[in-house]
């Protein structure tokens, strides 16, 4: 194991059938205005508008606005809620194939995910991860400001810092990192044809039923 390169591990739709940031927010926030916000972004206008704004500003406005509802929550409370949330995902949305891969590889684990830090930390501790890289919530005196201090959602490559590694992911946006990896384990959904067209000789594909659509 000492000479085994670490494996970079994504979380959302790789370890669990979940967009963990939004599913977590949905689970702990009950305000009507939050529910209306989520409902709007699920409409055709809201969905397409968010995509357009992202292309113009490189900001996921649905995510940014939703995270504001964490304002006023303590870091300790969020950690406790995240641990409870992940425990429930383990029971209902765990992707067994991915955990089998990690068990088989017996490699040091580096969590690298765009999800928020309280969730990534909860997952990382369960997997005894060597390192955890995630989007970081901003706190002031231990209280969440409702803002992101750092967002790595589409900028994971910046945080790797190593030359030799394997990767376990489902994200097409991770393709540049996948190409750098010595070994890649790809969780494929409706994007399986796209992945296969990349002709990644070092990749192992695992097909899952896409429950998002």
Task: Pin down the residues of each PLM region.
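Short, charge-rich amphipathic segments
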Residues: 26-36, 49-60, 86-97, 113
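Active-site neighborhood of HAD-like aspartate-dependent phosphohydrolases
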Residues: 1-53
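C-terminal cap/substrate-recognition subdomain and adjoining C-terminal extension
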Residues: 2-3, 80, 87-213
């Amino acid at each position: 194991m000492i000479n085994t390169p670490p494996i970079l591990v994504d979380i959302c739709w790789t370890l669990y059938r979940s967009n963990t940031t939004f599913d977590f927010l949905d689970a702990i926030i009950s305000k009507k205005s939050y529910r209306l916000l989520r409902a709007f972004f699920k409409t055709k206008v809201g969905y397409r508008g968010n995509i357009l704004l992202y292309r113009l500003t490189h900001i996921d406005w649905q995510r940014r606005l939703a995270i504001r509802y964490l304002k006023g929550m303590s870091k300790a409370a969020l950690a406790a809620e995240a641990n409870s949330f992940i425990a429930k995902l383990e029971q209902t949305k765990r992707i067994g194939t991915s955990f089998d891969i990690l068990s088989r590889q017996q490699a040091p684990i580096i969590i690298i995910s765009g999800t928020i830090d309280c969730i990534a930390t909860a997952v990382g501790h369960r997997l005894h991860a060597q390192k955890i890289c995630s989007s970081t919530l901003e706190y002031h005196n231990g209280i969440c400001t409702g803002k992101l201090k750092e967002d790595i959602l589409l900028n994971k490559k910046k945080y790797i810092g190593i030359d030799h590694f394997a990767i376990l992911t489902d994200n097409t946006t991770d393709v540049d990192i996948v190409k750098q990896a010595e070994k890649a384990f790809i969780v494929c959904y409706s994007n399986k044809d796209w992945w296969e067209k990349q002709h990644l000789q070092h990749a192992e594909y695992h097909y899952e039923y896409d429950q998002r659509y």
